Design a protein with these regions (language model features):
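An N-terminal, well-structured beta->alpha segment
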Residues: 1-41
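Short, basic/glycine-rich phosphate-binding loops at helix/coil junctions
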Residues: 9-18, 65, 195-205
Length: 221
């Protein structure tokens, strides 16, 4: 077998095992439903926060949430530390914080700010005793997994964060009874929007339809 293909298959196999662990973790905790309940009731936005690769996972999750009916904005922890905290609406918004270790120093002041101001925090981490989960209103503990390669960069853990975020977005969509029509209202471009357009939305109507008498000549007289 080609060496490159062998490495690729090993990588995917490792990540499949990580996803299996994530799937099994849902059977051991009711916390996920608490997250859905909380976010479905907020009057503002779900602000997704992370550092490094966790922020990039949060960025994708935030985009999916917004596409499927849950208004959301993503922030890097660094941006929040330098004025971004002003974007948080007290008594309206909720923070969804991603961090594998839950110990990123950039999160400390943000979590303290949220706690002081009564802003709900949903912490998602792989470390049960982490700073993030200690500060969190709802604690989501994802399984610790083997990273592909030599564990030099987040791989399997990033995949689990993305899958968990997709699960949340779809669950909220179902809870809110989000329809194809509403999806198109927020997704005006691309093949997805085109495929969901109904004929009555683009057809000519009334005076827009060019009528002509049946006894008219086709050539000008």
């Amino acid at each position: 077998m080609n060496k490159d293909i062998k490495v690729a298959k090993q990588t995917i196999s490792t990540e499949i095992q990580a996803l299996k662990k994530l799937l099994a973790s849902f059977n051991r905790s009711p916390q996920f439903s608490k997250v859905v309940n909380l976010i479905s009731k907020i009057r503002g936005k779900c602000l997704v926060v992370g550092v490094g690769k966790s922020y990039l996972c949060g960025l994708k999750t935030s985009s999916t949430l917004s596409s499927l009916g849950t208004p959301s904005v993503a922030f890097s922890a660094n941006d929040l530390q330098h004025g971004g905290l002003g974007a948080i609406q007290k008594n309206r918004d909720v923070l969804l914080v991603f961090s594998v270790s839950g110990e990123s120093a950039e999160l400390n002041s943000i979590l303290q700010y949220a706690n002081r101001n009564g802003i709900p925090v949903i912490g998602v981490s792989c470390k049960p005793s982490s700073m993030l989960l200690r500060y969190s209103t709802i604690k989501i503990l994802l399984p610790k997994v083997v990273e592909s390669g030599h564990s030099l960069a987040p791989t399997s853990s990033s995949l689990n964060f993305l899958s968990w975020g997709d699960s949340l977005a779809i669950s909220l969509m179902k809870r809110k009874k989000w329809t194809n029509k509403k999806f198109v209202e927020h997704h005006t471009g691309g093949s997805l929007a085109t495929a969901l357009i109904q004929v009555r939305e683009i057809m000519a109507k009334g005076k827009e339809i060019p009528f002509i008498s049946s006894n008219k000549m086709m050539r000008p007289q």
